[in-house]
Design a protein with these regions (language model features):
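Short Gly/Thr/Asp-enriched flexible loops that form oxyanion-binding sites at enzyme active sites
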Residues: 70-83
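Gly/Ser/Thr-rich active-site loops/lids in small-molecule metabolic enzymes
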Residues: 155-163, 203-207, 212-234
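Catalytic core of DAGKc-family lipid kinases
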Residues: 33, 42, 81-198
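Short hydrophobic-aromatic micro-motifs
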Residues: 133-140, 145-146, 190-200, 204-205, ...
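ATP/nucleoside-binding phosphotransfer catalytic cores, i.e., glycine-rich phosphate-binding loops
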Residues: 184, 216, 226-298
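A generic structural signal for short beta-strands and their flanking turns/coil linkers
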Residues: 176-178, 192-194, 218-223, 258-260
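ATP/NTP phosphate-donor binding region
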Residues: 1-65, 72
Length: 298
């Protein structure tokens, strides 16, 4: 019987990758589990997508090590493979912020994460579609969104979540509301918004938290969160209290829905982030979901 094959994609510039030694431990665990391991290190942005798409069909499992951006690239590559030929995917978090890993309790220790992935049953997860691109856990715009792709990598590596907060707070006085018409499963929201997210995660940029009871990763639905521009002191107070108390579901200052399909219409391109990766936006964007589109070893 042929050995199973595992492609190990490593981003050596990821925030917490101080040494590759722990990754050798993870590779040994995969080998002990019966996999022939092939390692590829990325050298430029987008290479994880290229590797996953071109080599993925030859492997049973594709593992990536890096931050959420590396995971996003890898999943985009895998999702370009016809569904019947898609390999399983696994993730060893090593970035400065790892929201997806936090949501699914994936250990930051490569050996522990690898051992868990080899021990537990694979799990099917929903995958988002933002225009022609995929996202794993969040598509967002507005406040703090620009921060995720403008903070220099070296600063992210040192300060992690705090780097995002510092840069976001620095820009609070220049926040510009976005005029948008958002249609979510037939319900229309037409107004000005400071922030918006379509997510499948309990953690967004390490700053906003949803309870595990609110989020299901395989139900064919996303969580839509919109922060309208507060027009009155009472609305501002409601917004501040909701953010402080992390009560996004029951606040009059926020819009929260479980949705399957979203259309966003604007008069201008609005920059967005997909799992922390920059997207230039477009005047009309269709956001959908492929239910159980990805099978992951967690």
């Amino acid at each position: 019987m042929d050995d199973k094959k595992l492609l190990f994609i490593v981003n050596p510039r990821a925030g917490k990758t101080k040494s590759l030694a722990p990754l050798f431990d993870a590779a040994a665990i995969y080998s002990e589990a019966g996999y022939l391991v092939s390692v590829r290190k990325t050298t430029h942005r987008g290479e994880a997508t290229e590797l996953a798409e071109s080599l993925g069909p030859e492997f049973d499992v594709v593992v990536c090590h890096g931050g959420d951006g590396t995971l996003n690239e890898t999943v985009n590559g895998v999702m370009r493979i016809p569904r019947e030929y898609r390999p399983l995917v696994s993730y060893l978090p090593g970035g400065s912020t790892n929201d997806f890993a936090a949501s699914l309790n994936i250990s930051s220790d490569p050996a522990k994460a690898a051992r868990s992935a080899m021990r537990l049953q694979p799990r099917e997860l929903d995958v988002g579609k933002f225009g022609e691109r995929n996202f794993v856990y969040v598509a967002s715009f507005g406040a703090f969104t620009k921060t995720t792709y403008t903070v220099p990598q070296d600063i992210k590596n040192v300060f992690g979540h705090f780097a995002y907060m510092l840069d976001g707070v620095k820009n609070l006085d220049t926040l510009c509301p976005y005029r948008m018409k958002i249609t979510a499963d037939g319900e229309v929201f037409d107004g000005e918004y400071l922030f918006g997210a379509i997510s499948n995660s309990t953690s967004i940029a390490g700053l906003m938290k949803l309870s595990p009871e609110t989020v299901s990763f395989d139900d064919g639905e996303f969580e839509l969160l919109l922060v309208p521009v507060p027009r009155t002191p009472a609305a501002m107070q409601a917004l501040i209290l909701a953010l402080i108390n992390k009560d996004y579901c029951n606040s009059d200052g926020l819009i929260f829905r479980h949705v399957r399909h979203v259309t966003a219409e604007t008069a201008e391109d609005i920059p967005s982030t997909l799992d922390g990766e920059y997207d230039p936006g477009a005047p009309l964007v269709e956001i959908g979901i492929e239910e159980n589109g990805l099978t992951m070893m967690l």
